[in-house]
Amino acid sequence: MKHRVKKHRLSRNSSHRMSLICNLSVSIIEHGRLQTTLAKARALRPFIEKLITKARVPDSLSVRRLLLSRIKNEAAVTKLINEVARRYTDRPGGYCRIVKTGYRVGDAAPMAIIEFV
């Protein structure tokens, strides 16, 4: 039974799952939107929203270091702090939207686009 299980496992072990989420978050920060499976989009949304909430704090070295420990890409962290987080200074949350786009041709996996609001 799945009582009190909060994580999306995505059929991967923890290190593989974390690197997948980190790579997806770098992609959405760089491009603004991302097409992926619905399960991966649902797993990515809480992770990226927590990063944006942390990045909204004015220039702080500790915040930059925390973000670098999470996504490990200097350019993405800089863009997250300087561009993405500044768009949402007045917004209390809900920075991402998931739009279902149908099913993938090869294996009929449900697909979705995750993008910044």
From Swiss-Prot:
Its GO CC terms?
A: cytosolic large ribosomal subunit
Which Gene3D superfamilies does its entry note?
A: Ribosomal protein L17 (3.90.1030.10)
Q: What keywords would UniProt list here?
A: Ribonucleoprotein, Ribosomal protein
**Highest taxon in the source lineage:** Bacteria
| Molecular function GO terms recorded | structural constituent of ribosome
What InterPro entries does this protein map onto? Ribosomal_bL17, Ribosomal_bL17_CS, Ribosomal_bL17_sf
Q: Which SUPFAM superfamilies match?
A: Prokaryotic ribosomal protein L17 (SSF64263)
What processes does the entry annotate via GO biological process terms?
Answer: translation
Cross-referenced HAMAP family, in alphabetical order? Ribosomal_bL17
Record's subunit section:
Part of the 50S ribosomal subunit. Contacts protein L32.
Name the NCBIfam families for this protein. Answer: L17 (TIGR00059)
Family membership noted in the UniProt record? Belongs to the bacterial ribosomal protein bL17 family.
Protein name listed in UniProt: Large ribosomal subunit protein bL17
Organism (species) = Neorickettsia sennetsu (strain ATCC VR-367 / Miyayama)
